[in-house]
């Protein structure tokens, strides 16, 4: 028994041994507590009251309800309900499993609850949360023990707080004692395993799994406690084993607001288990902040960029999707996307879509809400077909009502479309003007009435369906309007020829026949007459004429009578308005009532008495009678009675005697004095109305004439008749009888002859009338002959000195108000005048800024090149200042302006059309793309990479395209044929920088491309461009087209031309050579962009400057880029356009036709008395002002130290860009020589201008001759010219041969005259004898004195030019070396004159300014002085006068 008791005691000791271990920390509240166990606690500062530490021992006065011992106590009766007090245990941070044990005392004598004792566990100083354990009620007058199994470990720390909460009963005591930290597991509370974080997407269910070890009491509750204090009960507890169980806590559809820290808590009366805090991580599914971006829209596709860089929500993003739907549609589709851009296919044209982006992160429910939608509309697609079923509904004379099939969306493929009714008809006038109009009908309407038409016209109508992406034209249908009454015959078309009793009347068809003219009706009647015998108004007579008879001869009319004529035309609808005119017949000569010559009533030696009978007036009364006496002489032809040779000039006897005439007026009688026949004695020595009737001389024979005159309205008609003959008295009787018989026979013959003459005259008059009628029928209008002196119309404009003009423009422009500047045309604003304009007394400002051909009318129809507000047009007068500001501006200059073209720029490419594009093609915008006529079997045959470009006030004036590749040559010629193009502009070489830029699309002679045959007709080669003329024929067509290709070859392989002179001349040549009625001008370079755009901008701006006085380069380029992508490719090109326009405005058009040169030149050299200057001088000053000096950087090679000795003067150096580098190597000598390559008119680099060789450079000079194949040397200075500082030594052998370095020069022959010494040399390279020799002719000009700016003789200089030209033609057109002392003024004068003569021979033009400017582009010292410039004009004049004299 004893052993059994001992064994029980031993087991009891072992079981209880852990409980007697020393705690790691704690508070027993005893005075003699173990110092090894520190007691650290505190009470909250802001509690409602404080716990009271009491020590009650036996014998201590204390309430009987309290147990003995030292502990913390709360007397609840002393505090108000709801008041709280806390005891805060020290912070704990344990590494291993431990247990917090405490004792508590809750007692109320009446059994009511004194309050609630709660225990809180605060982790890392966080919020207090909810109590993990609490106890209420009265539990007897004894201590109870509870445990806390806290699973929070280092590095985290936690605090245990004990809270006393006063109950409403307020009776009893609450005590707390022995708060101990034990280093072993709790026996009464389970320990939780580590609780892990839970991550879930918002809106999804979450679940915490709490695993606990220990024994769970039946009454034990498991809770999920949120750090903020909320509690979630366990959905279920599952026992894994007898000491392990699992509590599950589901959270349904969590949101971001529920993201917090959570821990598991088990609660039982004997203690609580508390896990670590785990985080519930709620991820918000991602949603884009911004809608997707539209990159490009097509008719059936949208290309978008997802734009997902900024999102709302959490990543990572594992999937991207596009959700799209019609804006008004019920359906939606979702497509997965793997790239940042996505193309939505198979969309409907012109339809609005909502497009959103869906983003998905990992986990269920990871797909976020759709992002903000992009609402975008697809482009319209090209219409499926043109409208069909065009037919008339009603036809009237002046209007047509047409109808067609209604259109649906499946045809229009766009909600925004227009149906245009395009029609045209001819006016039918002599000009055959065609009226063309397109009328837009209202959308949805399929009926339209065309009004204000002309009757009986063929109206050609076609329907055009247009939407923003294209157009479809229907077949042309012809309708004819109904007839109407014709318009009135134009009164001015009535032409007539009045005679005495006839009128020839001619008229023209009405300007508006309004149908088929069936007849003409002419009515006439007399309305006034000066002949009293004529009854007025007379009866009205009417005649009708056939439709092809537009004239009539009215006969049997009364002389001197006015007739009213009315002419009107008739169609099937009736008569039109009549044209009225009054025509007066001519008065006729009076008529006499003499059947034959009467016998005299009496006769004496000095008198003869005749019978005067009154005459009858015809159309006018008789005004006066006159008796004329004529001495009969044998030599005089006899006057026949009734002849027209009357006596219109009254002549007295004295006047006739003084003038030696044989006739005189013997009497003048008033008409009223001869009412009836009466005798009159000739020679009665009386005076009748101022005319003396002297006695007749007996020994003379006389002829007596009686003349009647009628005067009316300034018109006089005479008739005279011989009424008697008086013979000389000296004749015997017999001869007298014979004479009298002869006289009688003569009288009879005279009467017959007179009658015959009258008959012939009448027949002649009729023939003349008929011929006039025919002529009038053939030609509708005869201008009256006017003596005109043709004024000299000059082709060029006056120019003043550029700098002074520009300076004036800067000061004058401020006085011109804005509305004035906009309202005035360029010519008005800038005082445009041409050379030879006599109305202009001086030169104007504008004349220095812009020259040109005589001002052409500038249309004001809508131009596509509109001036912008942010970039307004620049006045020509302000252009120089504007360019200088843009080049020197620091904030906003050409760079920024050029870059602004590409802001928001979106290049479009035509898909599936690779055939006509280059490797990196510039795409053609569909809206302005040239569409070829379709071909059978090839659906893509309508495509060519070409765009229509508007000109200045001329739509689709250009076609910009790329240089044809081999496979698109046929399409290129198809386009030229289809568009009726007459000009092709090519601005590229076939190969540049070793790359093929364009295929040779034209034949050497003749070739066929598809069904088009191209024949090269002519090639004209000039220095900077080539003009080729082709003839085009196409199978199935009878027409033959002529096309010119203008090939500009001077554009450098890199950058832009150094000067714009040649390009401007090229543009003018193209403009002048292109017929006004031709189709578009085709322009191409390689890609059809940069150079092509430069050309078009220059062409348009030159016209704008001429017509409006302003240039708007920025908006012009902007408009071009809207037609074709990237039309100006570089900033350098953009600046070049400005410089070129400035040069054009400053220099102007200076070409003079040969036919006008003499008069123009005379005007140019005339000194203006106001300015004391001439136009020629002003032109030379302009030349100086536009010749920039060379910069040091431009002459870097000439300035190298090793080359300084090769320059005669450091002031005259050649620029690097035109140096002829020597090819032949000669020891240590380098390849530099002071020389420059320059162009002639027809050949590039035709001249090499250099200085007279120095002694050290003579070998280099002959190397230059040989290396560049120079067959002519022109020497314009004299040997030993100037002083010893400028030696001009002989550099050739004469005679014999001499070696200069590698070159051997041999004198072959020579000729000389007073003007010129010509030598022939043979030059060869002794190091390369196999190359053969070069024959060179040396021309030494002798007629240019040392100190003169110009040659002594123009004729001698022309002789030099002719000899050089002749030799060049014979020797195969080698280069010409021209030298003078310094390679400047004299050499430039020679080259300029040679260039001008080439112009005359090639194109009958003279342009000295162009020749000099071109030369100065290479060397600024060419044509140095005003005298030399003047001399060039003199040489041209001398040459032309020589041509005229041949």
From Swiss-Prot:
Residues 888-1144, 1176-1439 form the Tyrosine-protein phosphatase domain. Residues 19-749 are extracellular. Residues 833-861 are annotated as: Disordered. High levels in brain, pancreas, and skeletal muscle; less in colon, kidney, liver, stomach, and uterus; not expressed in placenta and spleen. Also detected in heart, prostate, lung, thymus, testis and ovary. Ubiquitously expressed in brain. Expressed by hematopoietic stem cells. The chain crosses the membrane at residues 750-770. It is an enzyme of class 3 (hydrolase). Residues 288-383, 386-484, 485-591, 592-674 form the Fibronectin type-III domain. One of its GO terms (biological process) is negative regulation of cell migration. Disulfide bonds join 210-264. It catalyses: O-phospho-L-tyrosyl-[protein] + H2O = L-tyrosyl-[protein] + phosphate. Residues 771-1446 are cytoplasmic. PANTHER family: RECEPTOR-TYPE TYROSINE-PROTEIN PHOSPHATASE U-RELATED (PTHR24051:SF10), SUSHI DOMAIN-CONTAINING PROTEIN 1 (PTHR24051). This is Receptor-type tyrosine-protein phosphatase U.
